């Protein structure tokens, strides 16, 4: 167990009478290591120590009557040891800061029943934070409040709610106070007027007819349980392929053609940073390999287990630039062999006659009333192959700072529609947001489209446990056609905002 200052957590000490007036707050940072030692959000090599110091200094300054007991934990076992120490000298409550995505620290803390404040370090712990928070909300866990804000003051103000417990309030009183505070500190809706954007749509019937002729390649993984439901309900054929077939196509790619494609990317990009010409040529060869597999199998889309393939040495270039090119041309390049998201892309790209879907790992920032859609693959032709292009940059893949990936600087002022299709449940998850800008925060994925959600941002915290982290975003007001598609299929639409 490592304390926030890099020292071991302080041993339990004798309780002093003057301590009884102070709020004893255990702070647990859920993370792999003080300096990140592996590829994950936010990125390899990230130094959490200055962030931790900033959090603790802000709390100490604003809450002089608090005794802070900081520690780091990478999972349930480490957490259990810390909680065991706390039994000897009980604390009044817990602050759990999710610094990396999936470290399961908050769960054993919540089980204690003590007042617990759960906080996201945005663009770092957001995946786990959203999924775990949704689990707490679904189970109506009575002792866990949460904060998801880029504004440190919002965290500090929520921490002050622990004083309620010290004065005799219950854990439920504490949670209600944090929820009230979060709503009060979230800005009201802005101007939701959007720029005109006429979408050329197929009818639901014609869309479904075309989907029955479509094939999706799933390379190196995927969810076998969903494939049959995709075929039965949408008519899309999903063909599973091994990494070996993609790697062979990559090895056989025409080097001169790859060099020419890479030069084209260099000329088109607004900026290139930390990506060598050789790496870009490897990415172009991977694009040619993707195209070769699509042609070989007569497919219109491909989704690759890119992280497992690259980290495991099964593939030797990231597919991100190839997906960028495919999505720009009206075909489908889908991340992480996420079949659900790839099928969502196929369905709506077909219905909109070429508009690309943007798979993302979203982040919610209540300080700005925004949902930020983040990933390292994105199109720069949001209105379809014949539509306008937006600027893009070529950077490394964020988590490991290797390879080549895309930062697409997407247009502001447009209505967007975000979806996930669940054929196995006959459901469509749906929300909309107005595009209001792009975040250039260095942490986490390169493309970060900022949207102001239509509806209730509080409601947006609720569905991540059932649907996972990924969402697929399209430019355009697609509410009516999505509901019409659901009606044609006999499916239910779940509005998550």
Regions of interest found by a model, annotated:
Residues 1-14:
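N-terminal export signals
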Residues 12-72, 219, 226-272:
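N-terminal glycine-rich anion-binding loop in soluble enzyme alpha/beta folds
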Residues 399-497:
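Extended hydrophobic packing segments that form well-structured cores
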Residues 91-100, 119-120, 299-305:
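Periplasmic-binding protein-like
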Residues 257-346, 350:
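Long, internal scaffold/assembly segments composed of regular secondary structure
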Residues 327-442:
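C-terminal catalytic subdomain
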Residues 63-70, 120, 127-257:
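Cap/lid and interdomain-hinge subdomains that line or gate substrate/regulatory clefts
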Residues 100, 108-132, 140-151, 324-337:
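Short, acidic/small-residue loops that bind anionic groups at enzyme active sites
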């Amino acid at each position: 167990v490592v304390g926030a200052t890099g020292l071991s957590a302080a041993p339990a000490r004798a309780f002093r009478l003057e301590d009884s007036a102070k709020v004893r707050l255990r702070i647990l940072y859920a993370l792999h290591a003080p300096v990140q030692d592996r590829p994950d959000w936010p990125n390899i090599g990230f130094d959490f120590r200055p962030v931790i110091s900033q959090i603790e200094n802000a709390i100490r300054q604003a809450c002089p009557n608090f005794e802070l007991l900081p520690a780091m934990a990478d999972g349930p076992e480490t957490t259990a040891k810390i909680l065991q120490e706390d039994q000897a000298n009980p604390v009044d409550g817990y602050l759990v800061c999710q610094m990396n995505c999936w470290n399961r620290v908050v769960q054993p803390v919540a089980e204690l029943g003590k007042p617990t404040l759960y906080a996201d370090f945005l663009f770092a712990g957001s995946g786990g934070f959203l999924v775990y928070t949704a689990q707490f909300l679904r189970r109506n866990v009575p002792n866990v409040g949460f904060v998801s804000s880029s504004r440190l003051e919002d965290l500090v103000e929520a921490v002050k709610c622990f004083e309620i417990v010290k004065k005799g309030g219950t854990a439920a009183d504490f949670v209600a106070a944090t929820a009230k505070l979060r709503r009060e500190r979230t800005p009201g809706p802005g101007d939701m007027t959007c720029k005109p954007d006429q979408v050329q749509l197929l009818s639901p019937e014609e869309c479904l007819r075309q989907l029955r002729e479509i094939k999706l390649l799933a390379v190196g993984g995927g969810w076998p349980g969903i494939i049959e439901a995709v075929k039965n309900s949408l008519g899309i054929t999903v063909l599973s392929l091994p990494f070996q077939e993609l790697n062979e196509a990559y090895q056989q790619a025409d080097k001169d053609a790859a060099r020419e494609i890479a030069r084209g990317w260099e000329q088109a990009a607004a900026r290139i940073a930390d990506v060598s010409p050789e790496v870009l040529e490897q990415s172009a060869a991977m694009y040619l390999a993707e195209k070769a597999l699509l042609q070989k199998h007569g497919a219109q889309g491909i989704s690759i287990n890119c992280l497992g393939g690259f980290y495991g040495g099964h593939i030797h270039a990231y597919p991100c630039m190839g997906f960028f090119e495919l999505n720009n041309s009206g075909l489908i390049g889908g991340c992480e062999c996420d079949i659900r998201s790839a099928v969502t892309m196929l369905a709506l790209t077909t219905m909109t006659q070429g508009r690309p879907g943007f798979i993302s790992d979203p982040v919610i920032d209540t300080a700005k009333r925004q949902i930020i859609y983040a990933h390292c693959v994105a199109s720069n032709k949001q209105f379809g192959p014949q539509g306008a292009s937006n600027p893009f940059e070529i950077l490394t893949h964020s988590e490991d700072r290797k390879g080549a990936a895309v930062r697409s600087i997407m247009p502001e002022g447009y209505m967007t529609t975000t979806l996930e299709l669940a054929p196995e449940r006959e459901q469509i998850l749906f929300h909309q947001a107005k595009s209001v800008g792009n975040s250039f925060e260095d942490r986490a994925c390169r493309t970060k489209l900022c949207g102001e959600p239509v509806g209730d941002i509080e409601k947006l915290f609720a569905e991540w446990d059932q649907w996972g982290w990924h969402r697929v975003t399209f430019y355009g007001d697609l509410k009516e056609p999505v509901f019409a598609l659901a009606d044609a299929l006999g499916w239910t639409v779940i509005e998550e905002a």
